[in-house]
Structures are given as structure tokens and as C-alpha cells.
Amino acid sequence: MLMPKRTKYRRPHRLSYEGKVKGKNLIVNGNYGLIAQEGNWITNKQIEAARIAMTRHMKRTGKVWINIFPHLSLTRKPLEVRMGSGKGAPEEWVAVVKKGKVLFEVSDLNNSVKAELEALRLASHKLPIKTKIVKKGEQK
């Protein structure tokens, strides 16, 4: 699973995913990319599930770039615990994704466009947000 090796604070404030992304909105590495159409938190398990779906479909002929990383820890208190007495233990790690961010990029060594599009489609089904598949150079 993806998670930071070390953080400055164990329990940071929750970051907002509202609004548009300021940078990282262009496809740089691959031929096709998966762009977020709405904002949300994406957990490290969801990122890993999308990565596995893409790499299994592409096999050894393709390359996958992951442009998001779960830096933010979300805390949760145990069940049936009274209010107060602290914030709770870090439960999961999430990446803050805003609208317009490029999440994944793929390129196939055999130049099989069908395989690239299918890999991104499979990955999009593993994510909790609406996404759009875009070709390099065609996004605004």
C-alpha cells in the first residue's frame, strides 16, 4: 500500500477537495490519461486497486504512471467510545484530488490504443469519482 515513510504530524487537519486543481492538469508521460471530473479523497487501497487493474490488463507491454500519492492520514475513534479524550488513531491514508487533476497515465509499447483505453476504463471503475479519459495534447 502507498503511504508516507515519515510525516511531520501524525494527525493533520482534513484538507478540502473543493474547487479546481492549480497544476498537474496536463498529460506529460503517457499517451492517454485519466482526469478527475470531480473532487474527493481517494484512499491508498483504491489507488492500489486501480493500479493492479491497469497493470494486469496491460501485461508487460505497457507502462503506467501514478500521479497521486496519499499524504493525508484520516483518523477514526474506535466503536462505542465516548466523545472527547483525543482525536483518534490514524486509520487510513488518502490523496486529496480536485477537479481536473491527472490521476493516471498509460502508454503501450505496441502502440495498442485499444489496450490503453481499456486499462484506463478498468481503473476508473475502481475509483469513487467521475473521470474522463483524455489523449495527450487534447485536454485544455
Swiss-Prot record:
Gene Ontology CC, one term: cytosolic large ribosomal subunit
Gene Ontology molecular-function annotations: rRNA binding; structural constituent of ribosome; tRNA binding
Membrane spanning stretches: none
Key word Iron-sulfur present: no
Keyword tags: Ribonucleoprotein, Ribosomal protein, RNA-binding, rRNA-binding, tRNA-binding
Residue pairs linked by disulfide bridges in the UniProt entry: none
Transport among keywords: no
InterPro entries registered for this protein in UniProt: Ribosomal_uL16, Ribosomal_uL16_bact-type, Ribosomal_uL16_CS, Ribosomal_uL16_dom, Ribosomal_uL16_sf
Swiss-Prot/TrEMBL GO biological process terms: translation
Domain of life, per lineage: Bacteria
PROSITE patterns, sorted: RIBOSOMAL_L16_1, RIBOSOMAL_L16_2
Database matches in Pfam families: Ribosomal_L16
Family of the protein in this entry: Belongs to the universal ribosomal protein uL16 family.
Subunit structure: Part of the 50S ribosomal subunit.
PANTHER family in the cross-refs: 50S/60S RIBOSOMAL PROTEIN L16, LARGE RIBOSOMAL SUBUNIT PROTEIN UL16M
Job description of the protein: Binds 23S rRNA and is also seen to make contacts with the A and possibly P site tRNAs.
Protein name stated in the entry: Large ribosomal subunit protein uL16
